[in-house]
Amino acid sequence: MARSLQVAVQMDPIDSINIDGDSTFALMLEAQSRGHTLWHYEVRHMALKEGVSRVTGGKREERLFARGHSVKVVRRHGAHFEFGPMETRDLGGMDVVLMRQDPPFDMAYITATHMLEHIQPGTLIVNDPAAVRNAPEKILVTHFPDLMPPTLITWDVEAIRAFRAEYKDIIVKPLYGNGGAGVFRIKPDDENLASLLEMHFARSREPLMIQRYEAAVRQGDKRIILVDGEPLGAINRVPAAGEARSNMHVGGRPERSPLTARDLEICAAIGPALRDQGLIFVGIDVIGDYLTEINVTSPTGLQEIARFDGVHIEKAIWDRIEEKVAPIG
């Protein structure tokens, strides 16, 4: 039996989660059932303290602290968690940190990954912060061009117009968004592309991702969960009527979805790279025969897969975490 672990959960406010769908909640319940101790904090309460660090062998070490609470969780609507008193703890004293806050993948997010690196390798961070920083979901996928639909990432309006002229029906996405926010389908006869681009670039200095629209999305956008590079389950997310986006955040309907031969081919192609980078918990998105995104920040879908297939992937995730912590401890 694995020893009891001290587990810090870096996430958004726990009082706002949907306990019937939140994957972080499923991970916390599973950790608690194994006898691990949970501690909750938000990114905004982290502090990297220079000059107050302990001295070991004459070498000054920066220490990463956070203000947070010990927490117990229970599957009970309206009262799903119980906090201990607010306290400050040294995150370097934790066995595991689950990095589970949602994007946007902005400079605040990137800064948090840099701060977390100060407690490695003594603390296992899931997913590895440097790997997450180097693998934004909509960019990591471009390292597998043979698996993805025609795609353009650019600031150049003329390049976007040329891409549309070639492929006619396109999807326009903010590069660092999540949950389907800001995603538009521009049909061949749509006259709003110029206005959309003007609005985006007036507000943001970030490039856009443009992809060929895949009609197969009407049959669903499949989310496949990989644990340490191995596919363990999937759900299909079907767009609502009149909606181009299939994300569950915007009304996509989850349904059972077995893994196909093409799904397994995609997973076999990307799995070793994910494992080598320390990306233990990953969710990929597949439309038809194409890989469209690789989600490494805070993947979701665990509870939906459990409901449809009876497969509790959170157990496999904790099996792998415990295996990886053992040599550290």
Model-derived regions: residue spans:
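ATP-dependent carboxylate activation and anion-phosphoryl transfer catalytic cores
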Residues: 2-5, 10-12, 16-20, 244, ...
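Phosphate-binding site of ATP-dependent enzymes
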Residues: 23-24, 158, 165-169, 179-266, ...
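Short glycine-enriched loops at secondary-structure junctions
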Residues: 129-133, 237-240, 287-290
